[in-house]
Amino acid sequence: MARVRKAVITAAGRGTRMYPATTTIQKEMLPLMDTDGICKPAIQIIIEEALESGIEEVCLVVNRHNRAQIESHFAPLADEEMRVFQGKDWALLQSARIRQIACRLTLVEQPSPEGYGHAVWCAREFVGDEPFLLMLGDHVYTSGTDRRCARQLLDVYEAYQTSVSAVQQTPTELLHLFGTVRGRLVGQSPRVYDVDHIREKPLAEYAEANLRVEGLLWGMYLCFFGMHVLTPSIFEALGYAIDHDLRENNEFQLTSAQERVRERGERYLAVETVGDRYDIGIPFGYAQTQAALAVGSLYREQMLAALVRMLAVPSLHVPEAFRDR
């Protein structure tokens, strides 16, 4: 039985929606207090999700702007920094943890921004002929259980030995944000589906006609959760799109390649994941991420008390220009 040893995390986006913060710090390096109470760049939290789910090697697909920042973060402390942290055991433990991560890390550069599918294709030599976990470099996950979101997905792959995507039930009004699948439950499983159609960010009318899933409430669909376990056949499908310049909105899309893999006869599954995803690439999503991590942390009681105090105060005036963000 094949086990998933490798993960690919795409971190090549420019983070334009987080301007002006991303003028000086790349989106993936934005700081968050994790559930252990330690402040880390978001990308470290995402890498730890993979490693603590059983992954052994991680490839980050980066761009020429963020590569140096990421390499610097995962480099050993300089002598001067070691002196600064002398006697601070928690910091030295974190430094040791970062060195352990660095030993498992490979960076691959996407030469130009040509879409999510192209970023994944850039990792083909790292992946080789193995199945791999694919994650987004701007999504943080919480499960609220002792099984991380990535581990839930890996368990399904190991049981069925075929491509599988994490999904969540999502209402019609959010379909424009996510790839969406249609499928039927596998046997008596309450959460695993045999996928028979995949569509990137469908219109509501298309979804109602073509993507309804038996058993889901009306107006709810199975949408991508931001992580997948894929087989090397995805690179054949992506390579075909790149060789034939099959772009959508001027980019090479992963979703179309996933559908091409399925159409060629490979079984494709989806699993409803227990947990939540948070997008740090938008201002409100970033705020949501920090709130979720804080509420799930060792500072939970203090955070809840602070929220109660804040909610007791009338909200500040929000300028008209920012009300839709």
Language-model regions: role of each:
Residues 108-110, 166-167, 271-273:
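Conserved beta-strand termini and adjacent loop/short-helix elements that scaffold enzyme active sites
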Residues 142-228, 232, 236:
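Conserved core of the sugar-phosphate nucleotidyltransferase
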Residues 43, 123, 138, 181, ...:
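Residue-level signal for inorganic ion chemistry
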Residues 2-5, 185, 206-325:
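Conserved alpha/beta core of the MobA/IspD/sugar-nucleotide pyrophosphorylase nucleotidyltransferase superfamily
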Residues 1-12, 16-20, 34-134, 141-145, ...:
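Conserved N-terminal catalytic core of the sugar/cofactor nucleotidyltransferase
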